[in-house]
Amino acid sequence: MKKLFTLMLLVLMVSIITFAQDQPQRPGPQPPPETGETFKVGMAGYTFAKFDLETALKTLQKTDVHYLCIKDFHLPMTSTDAEIAAFHAKLKEYDVTGYAVGPIYMKSEAEIDKAFEYAKRVGVKLIVGVPNYELLHYVDKKVKEYGFNYAIHLHGPDIAIYPDAEDVWEHVKDLDPRIGMCLDIGHDTRNGKDPVADLKKYQSRVFDIHIKDVTATTKLGYSLEVGRGVIDFPAFVRMLREVGYTGVCSLEHEKDMTDPFMGIAESIGYFRGVIAATK
């Protein structure tokens, strides 16, 4: 009787497994349009200046974004090694990689030292920074010492330094080739420049890109959802391919920062739609 029961149980288990295998599997989503491109789609941590890390990561998960430029309000520069390890473990839960730190403003050699050591402990090879002009030769020294890339974040007409890609280029062209720029296409546009032309012209020094749209090519222009402003995104995506950009295009959404989520989704969706439509 016991053998019969065991045999019946085995037959039942085989039947269940066979039935499960015979059921059609529901198809999953297609991979994001940037799959197969040389560049990646990411998120600038500053987008979540009003929110904690968990909220940021849940948003990246919902939008299928896997690269984060780390801001120090999510991982303070004073973090211990244990806190840094816990931070990376949290990112891993959401299949997110922290690929850079910054932007970090640097007004002294001591602040530059602190930023480079922070990046080393975090385990990234790219710093997005804003050093005073007179400190660039010290940045050059630290780049040689650490072997990192250093991307200067341009800021349009709003602050006195690094208004556009041309200005960054003129200040770094004779320095170590690992010193370049984070091409913020919105700020570049607001200073009257063409980010498509600037990407082509300065491609050898473009190490990171911040994606946003703006309403005008002047200081009066302001940030809004990607696709609603004046930037020619189809031309920009084509130029990414033409120059073979291999870095990350990170959305830096600066509108409705206390409730940015609809704008983030719209912007990522539009940018990916352009990637798909221009293949």
Regions found by a protein language model. Give the residues of each.
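Active-site acidic/histidine proton-transfer and metal-coordination neighborhood
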Residues: 31, 54, 74, 94-181, ...
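Histidine-acidic metal/acid-base catalytic patches
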Residues: 21-45, 49-66, 165, 174-183, ...
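N-terminal pre-domain/capping segments
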Residues: 4, 19-126, 144, 268-279
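Conserved residues at the C-terminal ends of beta-strands
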Residues: 71, 104, 130, 212, ...
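Bacterial N-terminal signal peptides
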Residues: 7-16
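Short glycine-rich, flexible loops that bind phosphorylated cofactors or substrates
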Residues: 77, 136, 218
